[in-house]
Amino acid sequence: MRLAIRALLACAVLGLCLAEQTVRWCTVSNHEVSKCASFRDSMKSIVPAPPLVACVKRTSYLECIKAIADNEADAVTLDAGLVFEAGLSPYNLKPVVAEFYGSKTEPQTHYYAVAVVKKNSNFQLNQLQGKKSCHTGLGRSAGWNIPIGLLYWQLPEPRESLQKAVSNFFAGSCVPCADRTAVPNLCQLCVGKGTDKCACSNHEPYFGYSGAFKCLADGAGDVAFVKHSTVLENLPQEADRDEYQLLCRDNTRKSVDEYKDCYLASIPSHAVVARSVDGKEDLIWGLLNQAQEHFGTEKSKDFHLFSSPHGKDLLFKDSALGFLRIPPAMDTWLYLGYEYVTAIRNLREDIRPEVPKDECKKVKWCAIGHHEKVKCDEWSVNSGGNIECESAQSTEDCIAKIVKGEADAMSLDGGFIYIAGKCGLVPVLAENYETRSGSACVDTPEEGYHAVAVVKSSSDPDLTWNSLKGKKSCHTGVDRTAGWNIPMGLLYSEIKHCEFDKFFREGCAPGYRRNSTLCNLCIGSASGPGRECEPNNHERYYGYTGAFRCLVEKGDVAFVKHQTVEQNTDGRNPDDWAKDLKSENFKLLCPDGTRKSVTEFKSCYLARAPNHAVVSRKEKAACVCQELHNQQASYGKNGSHCPDKFCLFQSATKDLLFRDDTQCLANLQPTTTYKTYLGEKYLTAVANLRQCSTSRLLEACTFHRV
C-alpha cells in the first residue's frame, strides 16, 4: 500500500514537473494542430528532456489570447495588431520572442510605413485633404491602419463611419477591399475590370504594396501609403527613385532612401506572446531557440519550422528566418512603438483619446520618486493645470513613460539623454548655468560643464588618478555623465574590463546591482531602510550633492560636476553634514596624475559634459518648448511669481526636476538630435562604455536595430 501511495505521489510530482517544463502552444485551425503535433514529435526526437510542446486548440486568435491569460495555454504567435490587443486589459500579455526576416547577418524585426509622393508635387503631410490617395488594401497596416490612424483627427466630421470619413477627406482613392457600392469614392481610382475593380486580390492591379505604388506612378494618385522597401523593389535604379520623395511627420520631405528619419510608423514583426507574470518566457525562448537550431531554414528534411505542407503561415510566418528574444524590459507598448500605438488607438472607438495627442493643451512632466513628485504637484497647482505630473521610481522608468506617451517631458543629464535619444526622444531645451541675463540666456545654450574627480585635501598625497584601484568611490548614479559615464569610460580605456566593483574596494553608485560592493557605502532613505542604492532621491547619496556627501562621510573620491564643491561649502549648504565644510579642504584629481585646487577645474578635469536638457517625443517638442517658456516667465530665476508663489529652479532637497543652479532653459535648434547635442567626443566615450552597460531600457530601445 505504501509503495502504491509513493508511486502515485511520484507520478503526481513528475506530472507537475513536466507541466512546468511544457509549453502549451495555442493553435487556431486543424492545419495548425497538425503542424503543432509534428513540432511536438520532432522536438521529442532531438530533445527527449524538457522543454516539451503540447498543443491546445481554440477557434480564433482572440480565443488563444484569452486562453493564455487564463493559464489554459502558454504561447501563440500574433501579428502586430493582435499583439496590441493582447497587451490590453484584462489580458495583459507581453511579447517575449520576435520573428525576424531579411537575413541572418542583418535580422529585421520591423518595417516602416511611409507616404510616397512624386518629387514634383508641392504638398506636405498636413495638406493631404483633397488629394488622391493609393492604399495597399482596407485594414492593412502600412496601407490603411497607420496612415488613417495618424490622420484620424484631420478627417471631417462625422467620423462614426471611418470609410465614409476617409472618402470625404480624399478627392478620390483606390482602397482595395473597400465596399465600392457603399463608399464608391474609395474605389474611384482603382482600375480592375468589372467585378475585379477594387478587388481584395491581385485581380485589382493597384492591390498590395506594388499595386499602390503603381497607382502613384501611373499618375492616378498623389500619395501612396506603402512600406519603406516598396520603392526600392519597384525602382532598383537610383535615378528612377530620385523622382519620388517621402512625406515626414514634421511636415517636411526627404528622399526615399532616408526612410529611417521620415516614416509614419514602425510596424514590428510577428511576435510570440505570453503572460506578463509567470509566463514561462525562459522556457518559451529555450524551446524556440532549440527549434530554430534543429528545424530552422535549411536545417532539416523532416520538419520545417517556417513552412508546412498543410498550408501557409502556420504557427509562424513562412517568410521568417528565425527568432530573437525580446529584452525583458520591452513591454507591448515599447515593442509596438508610440506611432503605431497612437494610430491603432485612434482607430479604436473604445480606447480612442478624447482629444488628439498632438493638441498642445497640457504638458505631463515625469518626476522621479517622492520628493520630485511633491515639487511637481506644487508646480502643477501653480500652473493652473497646464503642467500635469506623472511619476516613476527611476530615470529609465520615466524615459519609458515618455516614449510610450504616458508622460511628455523631463530634464536629463547627458548620460540619460543618450539613452533617451536611442529610444527616439529629442532634446528640446537646455539648462544654462552661467549666463544670467534674460534673452541672452534663453537664446544661447552653453557649451557644457566640467566632470571632475574630488578628494579630501587631507587624503594621502599619493592618492591620484593613477592610484584609484582599491579606493572607495562615490558616484552620482549609474549611466549619469559626470558620476559614471565619463570617469568609468576613462577607466575602461585603461583597465579594459567592466568589473568596476572589483577595481574599487567599495562605493555608492545608485542604480548598480544592490548586492554589489558598489552599493556598500549607500545609506538609503532617512525615513527607513530598504531604499539603499536606488537611483533616486530616496538614496541620500544620489546625485551631485549626494555623491559629495558620500565623499565627506565615507568615501575616498567623488565623481561630480565642477560646481559641486563650491555649492556645498563655505556656508552655501546649511545641512548639518555640510555647514562647516571649507572649499580649501578638497582637491581635484587631474588625469595626468597631479592634484589641483577646486578653483582650477579648467585645467584639471576629466572631460567636458553637455548641460542637462529637457527631452520629449519629436511630435510633442514644439508644445513642450512653448509651455516651458511660459512657465519660466512666471517661475524661472527672474520670473514674475518666483519666489512669492513657486520657483522652478529651487528645491527642498537638491536638484529636483531641474538642477538648482539653472539660470534659464535655453532654446535649441529645431533640428537638434541627441547626437548633435551630446557631441562626437561624448558619444564615443559613452559608446565605448556600452559594453559595460546595465541599462535594460537601452537594450529594449535598440532591439529593432535595422
UniProtKB/Swiss-Prot annotation:
Chain sites annotated for binding hydrogencarbonate 1: T136, R140, A142, G143
Residues in the signal sequence: 1-19
Modified residues (Phosphoserine): S391, S693
Glycosylation site list: N515
Annotated disulfide bonds: C26-C64, C36-C55, C134-C215, C174-C190, C177-C198, C187-C200, C248-C262, C360-C623, C366-C398, C376-C389, C423-C701, C441-C664, C474-C550, C498-C692, C508-C522, C519-C533, C590-C604, C642-C647
Tissue-wise expression: Expressed by the liver and secreted in plasma.
Gene Ontology biological process terms, A to Z: antibacterial humoral response; intracellular iron ion homeostasis; iron ion transport
Chain positions with Dimethylated arginine modification: R40
Similarity remark: Belongs to the transferrin family.
Function summary: Transferrins are iron binding transport proteins which can bind two Fe(3+) ions in association with the binding of an anion, usually bicarbonate. It is responsible for the transport of iron from sites of absorption and heme degradation to those of storage and utilization. Serum transferrin may also have a further role in stimulating cell proliferation.
The protein's name: Serotransferrin
Organism: Equus caballus (Horse)
